[in-house]
Amino acid sequence: MSNSLPVPMSLNEYLAHLPMSDEQRAELAGCTTFAELHERLSAQPVTDPAEAAQASVGRRLTLTTADQLEDAEMLGVDASGRLCLKATPPIRRTKVVPEPWRTNILVRGWRRLTGKGNPPKPEHDDLPRDLPKARWRTVGSIRRYILLILMLGQTIVAGWYMKGILPYQGWSLVSLDEITRQTFVQTALQVMPYALQTSILLLFGILFCWVSAGFWTALMGFLELLTGRDKYRISGASAGNEPIEKGARTALVMPICNEDVPRVFAGLRATFESVAATGDLDRFDFFVLSDTNETDIAVAEQQAWLDVCRETKGFGKIFYRRRRRRVKRKSGNLDDFCRRWGGDYRYMVVLDADSVMSGECLTSLVRLMEATPDAGIIQTAPRASGMDTLYARMQQFATRVYGPLFTAGLHFWQLGESHYWGHNAIIRMKPFIEHCALAPLPGKGAFAGAILSHDFVEAALMRRAGWGVWIAYDLPGSYEELPPNLLDELKRDRRWCHGNLMNFRLFLVKGMHPVHRAVFLTGVMSYLSAPLWFFFLVLSTALLAVNTLMEPTYFLEPRQLYPLWPQWHPEKAVALFSTTIVLLFLPKLLSVILIWAKGAKGFGGKFKVTVSMLLEMLFSVLLAPVRMLFHTRFVLAAFLGWAATWNSPQRDDDSTPWIEAVKRHGPQTLLGACWALLVFWLNPSFLWWLAPIVVSLMLSIPVSVISSRTNLGVKARDEKFFLIPEEFEPPQELISTDRYTYENRWHALKQGFIRAVVDPRQNALACALATSRHRQAQPIEVVRMERVDQALKVGPAKLGNQERLMLLSDPVALGRLHERVWSEGHEEWLAAWRASIEADPHAPLLPLQPEGKASEPVPV
């Protein structure tokens, strides 16, 4: 529907949404057409009325920010003379060439035989070979051999105990001659108990070795933190107060994709202001690298970027770019940054969408890089904070209390051949560009294509090139947030599971350091241990059924004088069970002991932290079987080729509805009940051993829902349960993040795309930031006209997201659509725009709105 409004009336409404004085509005109110209005706003003649809105973009954009934009030289023109906003620095391209993967060892061997296996090194290869071999490399190798001996020795002893517990003691009494003379059914019945036992014993050995690795890691971390005598810690390489060299420029890059915009830019602003407080802001630039494909969120990002630059005077320091082609997801986003601007910086700090880092932490990372010339990556240990649901608070408490032990333990065993977790870390740009670009995995299927979990692979490539990868486990000032509930965590786990399984294809790639081969293996075991545990339990139940339902064979050989009795040693079972419990829960007890020794005030005191630990242990016991079944499903889905979506995890407090919980956990509850009934029917006494599993599954629905409640989390915090030091005495960066998040939500942009089309100021910003700036060409003009006509024909409600993205990226099409909506009076668009303003209780007060519409936020 068009032409529903007389031009003067709609023109007055248009002027009311421009930040002008009454005199300026009165002067422009005499215009008879919108083309004339835009011509007078632009103060230059307009030959084509269809381009009138495009001509006035500069004036509409700079009505309130002219001084700041001009001082920072943010305004420019493209090749066609259209105004654009310099949201990114000038491009200085650097070559980024990924090396193709050769994952097939047979093909690699053939290439070596034919003389094609060793391609020439690139000329720019500048590995730090002139540096002396650091002593830590030898020490790290010795430590890892010790760890391997401890793990295997512990596993062998436990396996021996497990073998003694099982009722059938080995295969020695199974006669091959007897088997060959029996029917297949008789052979199967005779061999089945032994086959089940052997499978159980094998799975037990793998799982116990996995638990043992975690135990020794936590134990060494405990000793490191208790004594404080770690001469190889990377944070000791710098005195901490050296001036940062002028050439040591660092880019803070934040890749985002359909994220919570108020929270993202609140954390960015808090980090920016913290860096500014150090006096070293001139050494840092900030980049928001968006892969967002939801147009409403994309427009909100544009406005949030403009607001944070205006409020912090960050024009020319805080940059924003949204990619139109989302190639290789997050790693491709970083590749694009390195290709366009990476050559301008010596270092890069990667931030996640929920990351917050203090200025002291960031400047310390730069100093550590300067003091350690062979370090390629230094990873901080982010501390979780900022969430209020009961589930998130327990996870925050667990990572804050137990996490330091495991992180310090990882450093003890790995030293400079450690992990990189993809964010809150500093990276040396030159070797990263030259060696860490990721080619897609060859082949077809679920484990081919773009690498999903890029961080472990980039660390492995950095180490393969001769650079160290360190964890600065004792460096404060690095923060992140956790998913608010179990289901959101599991969504994230599905992506991580698929990514880690893909990475294992690189296990035998030439040149990888053994430590990073082990990292690929542990990444797989993080999720593969779930189906192994599940199959272990299933086989144990099957063995119980065999022992209960099948008549035991006491005489296996002819003329056997004495029967072969199945053996049962309950004392060994209790001893092995107790040992396993110690390995699982002793690290948590050691964590609390360490807090007692160092000071428990920030955790609510000794009593509260101990009770919190016990409650968290109970909660982890309830959730372990639930995670086991979900992870088993994820592993099977990956191997079967079911697609894993890459939606961003929920980063705000969010309760799980009962319907959603029943949908997700209902099959688990049913499985737990049926499993319990089966075991009770077979042998009621065995149900006590299986009770922690089946009871947890049957309680999964209420546990998932209740733990996601914010009110319970807040009440626990008020009672000082699950308290962490970042809540007891919050750092300024987190205080600022909370305050800015609240303020940003108060003024958050709703219905962003409709605003970008209709609103005079929002349209100017969207046109100035649009990146599809083609030169004049007839085919392009035809496509633009078709897109604008289609948008006007179907209206905002029926316009698809892909069509919206095309319009948002094209400044000419967006300007023409804006001009025609107003000049032709397309009521469907105008009504949607007015409704979006009416639905926003905190919209700026405008002359045509009733008094009392807007009010100022009251920070909490």
Swiss-Prot record:
Xref: Pfam families: Glycos_transf_2 (PF00535)
UniProt entry tagged with the keyword Ribonucleoprotein: no
Designated gene of the protein: opgH
EC number: 2.4.1.-
TM stretches of this protein: 146-166, 200-220, 519-539, 576-596, 610-630, 686-706
GO BP of this protein: glucan biosynthetic process
Enzyme class: transferase
Protein name: Glucans biosynthesis glucosyltransferase H
GO MF terms, alphabetically ordered: hexosyltransferase activity
Pathway of action: Glycan metabolism; osmoregulated periplasmic glucan (OPG) biosynthesis
Family: Belongs to the glycosyltransferase 2 family. OpgH subfamily.
InterPro entries assigned to the protein according to its UniProt record, in alphabetical order: Glucans_biosynth_gluTrFase_H, Glyco_trans_2-like, Glycosyltr_2/OpgH_subfam, Nucleotide-diphossugar_trans
A Gene Ontology cellular-component term: plasma membrane
Membrane topology category: Multi-pass membrane protein
